[in-house]
Structures are given as structure tokens and as C-alpha cells.
Amino acid sequence: MVMILRRSLINQGADSGAHRTFIPELHTPKMSQGPTLLSCGIMENDRWRDLDRKCPLQIDQPSASIWECLPEKCQDGSLWHQEAVTACAVTSLIKDLNINDHNGNPSAPPSKRQCRSLSFSDEMSSCRTSWRPLGSKVWTPVEKRRCYSGGSVQRYSNGVSPMQRSSSFSLPARANGLSSPCHQSSLHHRFGGQPCQGAPGSAPCGQAGDSWSPDPHPVGGGRLDLQRSLSCSHEQFSFPEYCPPSANSTPASTPELARRSSGLARSRSQPCVLNDKKIGVKRRRPDEVQEQRPSLDLAKMAQNCQTFSSLSCLNMGVDDHSSQSPFALVSSTRSWTALLSASSPGGRTPAGTPVPEPVPHSFDDQFTCQEDLSCDESDGCSLDEDCCRKGDPATSWRDRGACTNSLCSLDGELDIEQIENN
């Protein structure tokens, strides 16, 4: 209701001529235009009940007689007397208020901190908790893996946004309700007989947009709630009974059929469907034919070790002849003859050089000859001994080989290459 109020100045007795429209539903009367007048909104609570609400108060300018400026008539037409007005207004309004400030300055508005403390009390601050980005129960993050072996799923005809094919293709998490019989027929209608490009070997869908589009004719009100979580286990969407293998796929052409009797045959054109299960697995190669390794002959190895040790003893006896007794050479010769007698019956040493059978009586002659030679050398042949020490070890070996009556005829020198090969 729009009321035209006519305000008269009672002291002057003249009309001000100010007419204003006033809507009481929109404008709650507040006396906040004067200096330090009711800035906290106390006028809204109980003071206006004392003054009848049927007679709203309108003030243009603050004046000395601010409480005397009241409308002449109320809505019901009853006149207010000046005595009743002054008694009601002054006693009820100015009793608790100090209109004029001591300094004459208008009061400053409350600070932000005071407003915050007033708007949010201390009792409620104990219940308030700081917001933290917690893990959402509705949307769970799905790791996105890129697949470079093929393109992306084409856009469906009804305008559904295209999905990029990846191994983490996911559907609503609460999909276990799809196993109810009311959803199975609709799923059979929507999911074609073609394995889905994105689901890892198990999620059958005719086209990608068809599985995501809401069912135009839901059976029993069943449709995929796409507002739910978009991550779920892929085992919930394996429906082997709805998608039989195609007619041209045989166990010979698709060997997955024999291995997966319960599941779906994976499309051979999509080699990366199961790449999340094959991370770091190399492609199997045909086994190479390994050559038969020769067995180890331990007896022959022992003979080779004895041969090497005996030859090294012979060389040491030749080099360090000055610091050794003359019987060291005889002992090394005995070990060499023992090695020859223990060799193979074909008369061949492990080095492969042909050796004649040893003559037993010549060994005694050699022993006596060696003793006589050592005695003669110890008596007076010091010059020959020095020459023999300073000479080549090969020539000394030839001299001793000739002295032994070709007991082990190695053609005058050792076959080093054969020894190294063995």
C-alpha cells in the first residue's frame, strides 16, 4: 500500500509541502539520519510496538523538535494529541538514549574486527574447523594413460562429448546395481556385440557414446547415473553372455578364445588394451637352441695342473741353480718321469708331444752321471759353472737334456704354446 503522508510542523504551524511515497513493507523506519541516532537498529525491536505501527514516521531532516514531527493522521483516521505524542515518544525513546554526543561529533562506524567478532561469536568459533581439501568420495582421481597405437573414440551422433581411449576407461562406481534383471535387458540393448575400445578386455559397448548416453527407454527406470563417481573396477562390466564372439573368429584365428573361455575375446587390432597389466613385461622371444657345452674332465684338469707345476719347478731349478743343491734338479726330473708314466697309454703327454717309453736302467746311469758331474764341478771347474750360470737357460736345458740320454726328448725346447692352450 502506498500512502501519501503530509507532514506539518507543529511549532511553526505551516505546511512543509514535502510529500513522499512510503512503502512500509520495504522501508523499516529507522531514526538513523540524525547525529548519533540509533545506528544499531534498536528502533526495530520493541520501540515501534509502543508507537502504533499503523502510524509510520518519516523524517527528512534532523531538527531540534525531532520527536514532535509526527503525522497528523493515522491510517484509521484517529487524531493523536500532542500531549500523548510527547509522553509516549519521549518516555519510550529518549529514556535510554543520549541523542547528542558530548563532543558533538558523529560516532564512527564499528571497525571490521568488531563486526567480525559480533557476527561470529566466540562460542561458535570453537565449532568452526578450517577447510582442507580432503579426498572426495564422489570423484576419485583416475590416472590417465595415453595410448599411441590408435586414435580416439569418434563423437557419437547425439552430441556426447568424445572420450579419449585409454586403459583407465571407467564408468560409475555404483554399477553393481546393473546386475539386477531390470538393467540387464537395457544393457543388452545398449551394449552392442562389439568389445569396447577403452575397457581393458572386458567392458563391452557398441559405441562409446551409446554407453554414456542416457537410455531413451529405460526398463524399470534403470539408467546409468552419470553424476556418481566415474571410477570403478573393470570386473563389474564384464558381461560375457551378452557379447558372443563374432562368427568369423575361430580358436585358430583368435587363440584368446581357448584361454578365456569365461571372458571376452580381445580385439586383435587393439594391442594396448591390457597395457596396465603388462607394464614392464617384454615380448616373449623364441628360445634359442643352446649348443651342448662340453663336460668338464676333472682328471685331465688335474694332469694339466701337475704339468704346469712340474714345468715351473724345472724352470726355477734352471734359473736359481746357484742357490739350490744339485739334488733339486734330480727331484724335478723324478717328478717329470712320474708324470710321463702316469700319462695316457698312447705315449702322449697332455701337451700333445710324442714321448718314447722311458728306459728304466738309463735313469740309474743318469743319476750316477749327475752325481759325478756335480762332484767334478765342486772340485775345480768353477769357470765352467759360472759360464753355465750366465748362459742361456735354453742352452743349459739342451746340455742337461743331452746328459739325460734323451729321457724326455722335447726337441731341445719347451712347447710353450701347447702348455698355454691346455
Swiss-Prot record:
InterPro entries: FAM53
Keywords, comma-separated and alphabetical: Nucleus, Phosphoprotein, Wnt signaling pathway
Residue interval(s) of motif Nuclear localization signal: 282-285
Biological process according to GO: positive regulation of canonical Wnt signaling pathway; regulation of canonical Wnt signaling pathway; Wnt signaling pathway
Main location: nucleus
GO CC field: nucleus
Modified residues (Phosphoserine): 119, 168, 170, 180, 213, 269, 335, 344
One family name in Pfam for this protein: FAM53
Location of this chain's protein in the cell: Nucleus
Record bears the keyword Acetylation: no
Function statement: Acts as a regulator of Wnt signaling pathway by regulating beta-catenin (CTNNB1) nuclear localization.
Similarity field: Belongs to the FAM53 family.
Subunit-level organization: Interacts with CTNNB1.
Protein name according to UniProt: Protein FAM53B
Protein's organism: Mus musculus (Mouse)
Gene name of this polypeptide: Fam53b
